[in-house]
Swiss-Prot record:
Family, similarity comment: Belongs to the peroxidase family. Classical plant (class III) peroxidase subfamily.
Protein residues bound to heme b: 197
Reaction(s) catalysed (UniProt annotation): 2 a phenolic donor + H2O2 = 2 a phenolic radical donor + 2 H2O
Source organism (scientific name): Arabidopsis thaliana
Name of encoding gene: PER42
One matching Pfam family: peroxidase
Description of what induces expression: Expressed under a diurnal rhythm (circadian clock control).
Residues at which substrate binds: 167
Signal peptide extent: 1-23
This protein's UniProt keywords: Biological rhythms, Calcium, Disulfide bond, Glycoprotein, Heme, Hydrogen peroxide, Iron, Metal-binding, Oxidoreductase, Peroxidase, Secreted, Signal
Catalytic residues of the enzyme: 71 (proton acceptor)
Positions contributing to Ca(2+) 1 binding: 72, 75, 79, 81
Site (Transition state stabilizer): 67
Protein name: Peroxidase 42
């Protein structure tokens, strides 16, 4: 090769290196641990303190934080679309039937306001939703879960997609497994996530079909009188606060008692019953019933996968000024 040829190759190599360097420089950051360490170093501490204060005042907030992460992150993207209010043109996700019983959204706003006082326009509502779930899990005795941050907020609700992603409590375990698989959560992860039914409550409107007109014979007969006492109406008023605690033994503690209950046919929802008796999930249920450390390990892994489901990062989406409104509607 002549001198000119060597020179041309050298120039092309330098150009390629320069282009690669620019591409790396311009690549948008994704999720990472401690994303706010430079822009809002106190962010995670503020969320932690706010959740502790709110939990001290209202114990049931912990259950709300836990439900929020599932209902938001399972529906296509972990982008806080769940928090958006309905508009004249669009029904908000939180108003959909699949979101029945979700509440305490105003407390997300309290956390947002505390963060805005410290670092205006920096911390996204989607990160608040995820971090508050982590703190809520720990507040009810669950494991501390390391979670990445750096999400940005979506611009619109995804109400039209809810039924495609969120399983209904009456659907078969095969459908539930498939929906979780679509977001990267395997069978042990699904079984662990449903262990969140260890805390909180089930509204009567979601379980009366197992009591009326005839009691579901698969229910433990020792548990039925309590369910009938708590849900005395075959058509309960959806606005009435009628419910059964998911776990009468340790209702405020996230533990593996749920698995022992469903093996004893005390699960309130059909999905609980199927989980305990389907050949694909029963061995995992039995293992988690005996080994809380295994339950916590799989639960941690599943929450991490869920929290990283298709997030908006870099320049995508926005940082909302108010969590219930996209900035264009502010």
């Amino acid at each position: 090769m002549g001198g000119k040829g060597v020179m041309m190759v050298a120039i092309l190599c330098l150009w390629a290196l320069s282009a690669t360097s620019e591409a790396v420089t311009e690549a948008e950051p994704g999720l990472m641990m401690n994303f706010y360490k430079d822009t809002c170093p106190q962010a995670e501490d503020i969320v932690r303190e706010q959740v502790k204060l709110l939990y001290k005042r209202h114990k049931n907030t912990a259950f709300s934080w836990l439900r929020n992460i599932f209902h938001d992150c399972a529906v296509e993207s972990c982008d806080a679309s769940l928090l958006l209010d309905s508009t004249r043109r669009e029904l908000g996700e939180k108003e959909h039937d699949r979101s029945f019983g979700l509440r305490n959204f105003r407390y997300i706003e309290e956390i947002k306001e505390a963060l805005e006082r410290e670092c205006p326009g920096v911390v996204s509502c989607s990160d608040i939703l995820v971090l508050s779930a982590r703190e809520g899990i720990e507040a009810v005795g669950g494991p501390y879960i390391p979670l990445k941050t750096g999400r940005r907020d979506g611009l619109k609700s995804r109400t039209d997609m809810l039924e495609s992603y969120l399983p209904d409590h009456n659907e078969s375990i095969s459908v539930v497994l498939e929906k979780f698989k679509s977001i990267g959560i395997d069978t042990p992860g699904l079984v662990a996530l449903l262990g969140s039914h260890s805390v909180g409550r089930t509204h009567c409107v979601k379980l009366v079909h197992r009591l009326y007109p005839e009691v579901d014979p698969s229910l433990n007969p020792d548990h039925v009188p309590h369910m009938l006492h708590k849900c005395p109406d075959s058509i309960p008023d959806p606005k009435a606060v009628q419910y059964v605690r998911n776990d009468r033994g340790t209702p405020m503690v996230l533990d593996n008692n749920y698995y022992r209950n469903i093996l004893d046919n005390k699960g309130l929802l059909l999905v609980d019953h199927q989980l305990a008796h389907d050949k694909r999930t029963r061995p995992i249920v039995k293992k988690m019933a005996k080994d809380q450390a295994y339950f916590f390990k799989e639960f941690t892994r599943a929450i991490q996968i869920l929290s990283e489901n298709n997030p908006l990062t870099g320049s995508k989406g926005e940082i909302r000024k108010q969590c219930n409104l996209a900035n264009k509607n502010h």
